Amino acid sequence: MARVGIMETAIRDGHQSLLATRMRTEDMIPILEKMDAVGYHAIECWGGATFDTMLRFLKEDPWARLREVKKRLPKTQTQMLLRGQNAIGYRHYADDVVREFCDRSVQNGMDIFRIFDALNDTRNLATAFEAVKKSGGHVQGTICYTVSPVHTVDKFAAMATEMVGMGADSLCIKDMAGLLSPMMAKALVTRIKADHPEMLLQMHCHDTSGYSEMAYLMGVQAGADVIDTAISPLAGGTSQPATETLVAALSEDPELATGLDMGLLGEIAVYFKEVRRRYWKFESNLLGIDAGVLSHQVPGGMISNLVGQMREQGQESKLPEVLLENARVRADFGYPPLVTPSSQIVGTQAVLNVLTGKRYGNVTKETKNLAKGMYGTTGQPISAEILQTILGDEQPITHRPADDLQPELGAAADEIGDLAENIDDVLSYVMFPQPAREYLQWRKEGGGPERELVAAVIGAMFVRPKKATAGQAPVLMAANGAVEQWKSYGRQRQMR
């Protein structure tokens, strides 16, 4: 019997990390039957940035994707990433929104909810925990791992115990920046499993620093039950380590073997290798190991964002200075984990501090809200000096931020009107008002068939029967007939 379970991230975090979350549902559907037969513990297929990207760029219904994927995975659990009170958006939502979103997610086919808060503030997890359990879903309480003087094994273990008391069905150590060292993985897993031997413990690591395979090995030897991996064509860099590599390595120890079908994994890898080539335009620039993250602690996606901001200002040469300032801003704010939305808040403020030449001379609204406690409490209290600089005489709140929010669903339903065909559409609108409205209007006006025709025409205008260049050839060679080739290429032109 398999001792270590594998959660496959290819159709969520794999392409989110490497291909800007652009993989379309039609490129997932053909391989799901084989993925279902592999023997995965779960397949991550939803949440994170997928919802926003589908509405904003792909003109797809996120709820329809979930239903289509679930329909093709009768043997395998589905899993998603939920940002606590932020759900799958970028701000705190009222409790009625979070409850309805969790219930509708279960009804549409979601099994396991990995629920985290960017600041590790468990008050921001409570409503989602309660809602998922009430709807019959599985609650995975999540620790956002980070490195700082205040983030110790004791602190993380205390959070795990608190989440167990809140009703978590399993626990996860989420290492979004690739900072979890092998020794810390061993220490943290050992402690949590000693405190809660009955709880399934899962590890989620990114390969940014090159630590992840070693951290996984030490973790499973210490008692971790499940690890997250991505099939090899969508692995490495800022994604997870390769599924096949970990399966093969663990198979050498009968007590750790996963029991996954390596033959099927090979076939799945061949499929996704071809799929990835269709998305060459969206390839990440961060494909290899970045050991620098071990010092500056900035996740790969956040570095891309910082580079973009500096490039817009013609100040790319100041990136090293921004990375140093990023660490200072993070320390000023009590060492929040650098994950959405705290990573964007800290990073943008660091850029402003460097470009203006005056620390906190220009403060963003989000920075002010972080200081006010509008996102929750940070790893340690923010110093009085920083609070005075940013807030003046205004006092930060001490209660749960969402307690100040009034119910939102009723007003949202009135605003979107008959563009929404059901409550799922209303939820999409609440999360992403403008992208959802544009998508729902497009759908009402006909959507699909016209888009296919336009995509084919655009593709036909740009495709040329010339010798293919490296990286682009698969886009033109992989489809089933000329029109399909044009559509594939044309869609990517539309996503610009």
What spans do the regions from the language model cover?
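Catalytic alpha/beta core domains of metabolic enzymes, predominantly
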Residues: M176-N362
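Glycine-enriched alpha-helix->loop->beta-strand junction motifs that scaffold or abut catalytic
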Residues: G39, G109-D111, S135-G137, G165-D169, ...
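Terminal or standalone catalytic/regulatory effector modules within metabolic enzymes
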Residues: K34-M54, N285-V293, Q297, G301-K466, ...
